């Protein structure tokens, strides 16, 4: 199920949300059956955008940081989920090694590592933090502003295992997305569980592959709800490798942008939506170099090309994804906000709002200047009444977020099955 958390939604429940609330038993049964056939990612975080008429995931992170943004009240949910996940993968586990990002001395990021260490310690494991950063040659302890501290130890490689001094883990938890490539020290670890698996890293993963899988999940969920899948799915176009420093590259991207905008315009017309449609252009491989650009017409492509072309050295050809833009109608203290839902195994364990006071409702909020507002548990005195439809007495406005986020997690499960190098080839 989904915890009852307080959202920024204050208006009346719209048709889509009501359908989701009314379909709660059917939805939960559907997820249970799916998880009998598919293995959920070990953990993930999903960025959602709620435009009022549409709620859709715009990013699914399989190596989530930010665990320190969850409230202390959410800790028991995370611990229970961690226990379930470990029990399923390695029931005899005692020792867990967490591997953080390299070159990360940010106290905010390290507070996230401390929270992960706390969660798995409370789940009954011995937990150490092992760094694969070549610059870390001996244990270092970093004091954090809240009084916590974290000790980073250099990882030691054996023949078929890794660990840290006097600590041999059976399970390795990656909290780094390896977008620069998979280092040799993590390869061929056939005697230890590596979570998430290496093929979940951005070295091989593509956003377009994820959203292709999500498109399939959205169709099935839409059929269950009796609703248009578009209401929970952002359309997209995969551009492939494009060199935006060349006229042909700009033309190709411009064609894809116009094609997707035309599809979105048709949907807006069908639903009587008066907003002006837009798309976002981003790297398909999860790299952050080109950023995320909002475009309302093909003229914006030339501006993006000029901006990237001014960089030295020029970035060259990049895999690019064009995705339907989804407005966000949510606000926290007048600032534009988007919910981020955190999951472990198949469970929703919490979430927070990412907010940005200087960004518009059609812009990417994952940018310098953003901040985070934890979601609190609903302190409702209205208990559900027997005989009343699910969700009718005290509706959980967070439930819809939990459904769409879990649908994205299910899509990630499909995606990892398809990209698993050890899986049997499917005809």
Task: Please tell me what each predicted stretch does.
Residues 237-250, 278-306:
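Glycine-rich phosphate-binding loop of ATP-grasp-fold ATP-dependent ligases
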Residues 81, 104-275:
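Conserved N-proximal alpha/beta basic substrate-recognition cap immediately N-terminal to
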Residues 54, 256-266, 271-278, 290, ...:
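Phosphate-binding site of ATP-dependent enzymes
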Residues 2-9, 35, 63-97, 356-427:
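C-terminal active-site "lid" helix and adjoining low-complexity regulatory extension at the edge
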Residues 1-28, 38, 44-45, 56, ...:
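Low-complexity, highly charged intrinsically disordered N-terminal segments
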Residues 39-42, 120, 165, 333-336:
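Short solvent-exposed loop/turn micro-motifs enriched in small/polar/acidic residues
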């Amino acid at each position: 199920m989904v915890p009852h958390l307080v959202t920024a939604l204050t208006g009346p429940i719209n048709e889509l949300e009501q359908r989701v609330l009314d379909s709660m038993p059917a939805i939960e049964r559907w997820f249970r059956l799916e998880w009998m056939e598919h293995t959920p990612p070990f953990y993930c975080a999903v960025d959602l955008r709620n435009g009022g008429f549409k709620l859709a995931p715009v990013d699914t992170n399989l190596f989530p940081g930010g665990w320190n943004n969850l409230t202390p009240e959410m800790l028991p949910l995370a611990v229970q989920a961690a226990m379930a996940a470990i029990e399923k993968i390695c029931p005899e586990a005692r020792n867990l090694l967490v591997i953080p990002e390299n070159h990360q001395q940010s106290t905010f990021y390290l507070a996230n590592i401390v929270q992960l260490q706390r969660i798995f310690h409370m789940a009954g494991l011995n937990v150490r933090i092992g760094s694969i950063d070549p610059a870390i040659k001996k244990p270092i302890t970093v004091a954090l502003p809240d009084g916590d501290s974290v000790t980073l130890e250099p990882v030691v490689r054996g023949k078929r295992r890794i660990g840290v001094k006097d600590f041999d883990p059976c399970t390795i938890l990656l909290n780094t997305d390896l977008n620069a490539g998979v280092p040799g020290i993590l390869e061929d670890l056939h005697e230890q569980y590596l979570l998430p698996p290496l093929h979940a890293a951005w070295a091989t993963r593509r956003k377009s592959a994820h959203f292709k899988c999500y498109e399939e999940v959205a169709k099935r969920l839409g059929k269950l709800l009796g609703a248009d899948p578009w209401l929970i799915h952002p359309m997209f176009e995969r551009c492939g490798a494009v060199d935006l420093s060349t006229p042909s590259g700009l033309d190709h991207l411009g064609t894809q942008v116009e094609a997707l905008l035309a599809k979105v315009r048709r949907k807006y017309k069908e639903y009587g939506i008066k907003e002006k449609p837009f798309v976002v252009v981003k790297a398909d491989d999860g790299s952050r170099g080109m950023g995320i650009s909002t475009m309302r017409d093909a003229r914006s492509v030339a501006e993006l090309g000029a901006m990237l072309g001014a960089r030295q050295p020029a970035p060259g050809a990049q895999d690019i994804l064009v995705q339907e833009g989804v407005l966000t109608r949510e606000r926290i203290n007048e600032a534009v906000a988007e919910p981020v839902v955190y999951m472990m195994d198949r469970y929703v364990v919490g979430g927070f709002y990412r907010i940005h006071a200087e960004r518009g409702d059609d812009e990417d909020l994952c940018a310098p200047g953003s901040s985070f507002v934890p979601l609190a548990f609903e302190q409702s005195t209205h208990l559900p009444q027997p005989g009343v439809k699910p969700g009718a007495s005290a509706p959980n406005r967070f439930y819809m977020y939990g459904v769409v986020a879990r649908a994205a997690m299910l899509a990630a499960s499909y995606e990892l099955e398809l990209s698993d190098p050890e899986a049997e080839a499917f005809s």
